[in-house]
């Protein structure tokens, strides 16, 4: 599997593209549709799924145009955040501080994640683990063969996700990272929702929220 990234201008958010021999998965389609479209066309493979680490607006701004353009591949999301796709107050686009932008309202998802299930299809193999705390339905995707994890807004390089938002919980976030991410081998690459890549070992050693 090959992994590509584009960076969206709204919230400097990362969209990921996972390429198998035959298909493509898109993770968290953010604000820059033109860049997302160009990357998909460059890869040139059919999209078999769209995975959402969570449903804050910056991670879903191109979701519906992506679906409409590429024959409606199924969208996977945590059930606890499924309604946020079409509820601006919960995906945060409807908050007063975002009055300068349009509300983000998407169609419902087709699939809910099953935690700890091993997903295997179209050349992909991954496990979904809960990493709530930044938002109640935050998840991470573990790819054992590629020895990496996509963490959304749970774990970043030398920091963690915000916990001052609706449904955020600092203790839940720390617990999820320690029990579902830091249990991975130290050499695993971490692909976060914002910022540069890191590793499990680096975060254990240098993340100020976990340094001993």
Model-derived features with residue positions:
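A structural micro-motif
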Residues: 1, 45, 73-74, 124, ...
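Short Gly/Pro-enriched turn/cap motifs at secondary-structure boundaries
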Residues: 6-7, 108-110, 130-132
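Residue-level detector of beta-strand structural context in well-folded domains
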Residues: 14-16, 111, 116-117, 139, ...
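Active-site HxH/HxHxD metal-binding segment of metal-dependent hydrolases
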Residues: 32-35, 41-118, 205-209
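Metallo-beta-lactamase
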Residues: 91-94, 125-212
């Amino acid at each position: 599997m090959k992994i590509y990234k584009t960076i969206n201008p709204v919230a400097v958010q990362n969209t990921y593209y996972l390429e198998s021999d035959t298909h493509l998965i898109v993770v968290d389609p953010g604000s820059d549709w033109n860049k997302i479209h160009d990357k998909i066309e460059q890869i040139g493979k059919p999209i078999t799924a769209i995975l959402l680490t969570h449903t804050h607006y910056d991670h879903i701004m191109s979701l519906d145009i992506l679906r409409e353009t590429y024959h409606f591949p199924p969208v996977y999301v945590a059930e606890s955040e499924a309604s946020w796709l079409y509820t601006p107050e919960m995906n945060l686009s409807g908050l007063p501080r975002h009055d300068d932008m349009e509300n983000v309202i998407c169609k419902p998802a087709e699939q809910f994640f099953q935690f700890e299930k091993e997903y295997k299809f179209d050349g992909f193999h991954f496990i979904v683990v809960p990493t709530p705390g930044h938002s109640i339905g935050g998840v991470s995707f573990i790819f054992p063969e590629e020895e990496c994890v996509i963490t959304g807004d749970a774990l970043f390089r030398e920091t963690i996700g915000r916990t001052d938002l609706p449904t955020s919980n600092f203790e839940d976030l720390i617990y999820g990272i320690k029990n579902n991410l830091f249990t991975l081998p130290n050499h695993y690459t971490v692909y976060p929702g914002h910022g540069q890549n890191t590793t499990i070992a680096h975060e254990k050693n240098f993340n100020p929220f976990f340094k001993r």
